[in-house]
């Protein structure tokens, strides 16, 4: 697991966006795994800027989103399909037919989960998967106690996640308690995983992910098993790690080696 500690949230977004841009340059028909929530928005703004400046094109790219609320159709303003259209897809040259989000209004959500897994496999798997992290260590909607080998499935949201997301819904508006989410096993099959975290409220989750045991109590700790997992975090999110300067030293030395080798 690679840990990159940067000064602030803006630097985290730029660094993360650069990883995705380099991936697309290397493989124009890349399959991207995308995430919602407040943290990825700044990264998406960087991707939109790069597209407008002619530094990247998404014409051959396809994407799969991590999750969706069960019970919301794509036109609902709080659906993740709506979010992705507003925050990214409407502003770049990606073919929306090649952007998949789990169907929150599926008549048979269990069958829809199996079809989602099949679609990922048919595309050859995900090249780079973007993740955020919840205060309780959840990734996607894989809440604590989720199986570390789980696949795309219907999941019940914890009260903590429901409360965290309540700010996006009006007080009298229906708020889903169920979701469709890629499983942890699905995420781990991605060729590369990029997790973003900013703010002191994510510090406990980051410490558990990086320095804690591998455990279903912190779903993100499963990334310890991934050879190409990159955590990009700001100083605040890193504040509870045991030795921040050591992680910075590791990254500096690794970067020197990569620069010398021309990577």
Curated annotation (Swiss-Prot):
Task of the protein: Catalyzes the reversible isomerization-deamination of glucosamine 6-phosphate (GlcN6P) to form fructose 6-phosphate (Fru6P) and ammonium ion.
Taxonomic source organism: Cellvibrio japonicus (strain Ueda107) (Pseudomonas fluorescens subsp. cellulosa)
Pfam families noted in UniProt: Glucosamine_iso
GO molecular function, a single term: identical protein binding
Protein name, entry field: Glucosamine-6-phosphate deaminase
NCBIfam families: nagB, PRK00443.1-4
HAMAP family: GlcN6P_deamin
A GO CC annotation given for this chain: cytoplasm
Reaction equation(s) it catalyzes: alpha-D-glucosamine 6-phosphate + H2O = beta-D-fructose 6-phosphate + NH4(+)
Pathway annotation: Amino-sugar metabolism; N-acetylneuraminate degradation; D-fructose 6-phosphate from N-acetylneuraminate: step 5/5
PANTHER family in the cross-refs: GLUCOSAMINE-6-PHOSPHATE ISOMERASE
Family that this chain belongs to: Belongs to the glucosamine/galactosamine-6-phosphate isomerase family. NagB subfamily.
